[in-house]
Amino acid sequence: MDKLNFFEEIRKDAEETYKLNPEDADNLMRWGEALLELSQFQNVIDSLKMIQDAISKLEDAILIDPMKHDAVWCLGNAYTSYARLTPDDTQARLNFGLAYLFFGIAVAQQPDNQVYHKSLEMADKAPQLHTGFHKNRLLSLLGGVETLAIPSPKVVKNKKSSDEKYIVMGWVILAIGVVACISFRKLR
């Protein structure tokens, strides 16, 4: 079974399971992940719509289980995917910022998960890479020969363990605030 059919089958199963149990956070996460994967096979407009739907499913999963770190991480991926497809720099930066926020929450929930740390690190660099990519693309579309250099990544200095405790506590407090905001938004 190819990748498209595989994720389409997961999406359909999740949709059916949702009808039976709309409070199943694991199922909502699977549904969001499947939509995110399926978005890669769409044109840009349909892909953005599918990513928005994935974001909605993942937010619902987090509302049900705020400590579901894998759903939080996947939500960061969804915002990253959305930002990459957004040519408007301001809108892209907003979505990259949300991705960074959710990756940070995932790191706070699972500090030993290296994938989460790497995602957070990449999300920090993503806005610069996005801007460089779209500027280079614009130059090539306009027939320009000049290419823009991608800025070199910042050197990350080691932090003291006491600082890390405050950072983790900050992310936990921020996570509570984000969950409260999402809950409030869903109620309206």
From Swiss-Prot:
Key words, A-Z: Membrane, Mitochondrion, Mitochondrion outer membrane, Protein transport, Transmembrane, Transmembrane helix, Transport
Mutant lacking the gene: phenotype: No visible phenotype.
Matching InterPro entries: TOM20_imprt_rcpt, TPR-like_helical_dom_sf
Source taxon at top rank: Eukaryota
Gene Ontology annotations for the cellular component aspect, listed alphabetically: mitochondrial outer membrane translocase complex
Residues in the Mitochondrial intermembrane compartment per record: 183-188
Gene3D superfamilies listed in its UniProt record: Tetratricopeptide repeat domain
GO terms, biological process: protein insertion into mitochondrial outer membrane
Pfam families noted in UniProt: TOM20_plant
PANTHER family: MITOCHONDRIAL IMPORT RECEPTOR SUBUNIT TOM20-1-RELATED
Note, other: There are four genes (TOM20-1, TOM20-2, TOM20-3 and TOM20-4) which encode mitochondrial import receptor subunits TOM20, but TOM20-1 is the only one that has not been directly identified in isolated mitochondria from cv. Columbia.
Family: Belongs to the Tom20 family.
Subunit: Forms part of the preprotein translocase complex of the outer mitochondrial membrane (TOM complex) which consists of at least 6 different proteins (TOM5, TOM6, TOM7, TOM20, TOM22/TOM9 and TOM40). Component of a mitochondrial large protein complex that contains, at least, MIC60, DGS1, TOM40, TOM20 proteins, and petC/RISP.
Protein name from the UniProt record: Mitochondrial import receptor subunit TOM20-1
Gene encoding the protein: TOM20-1
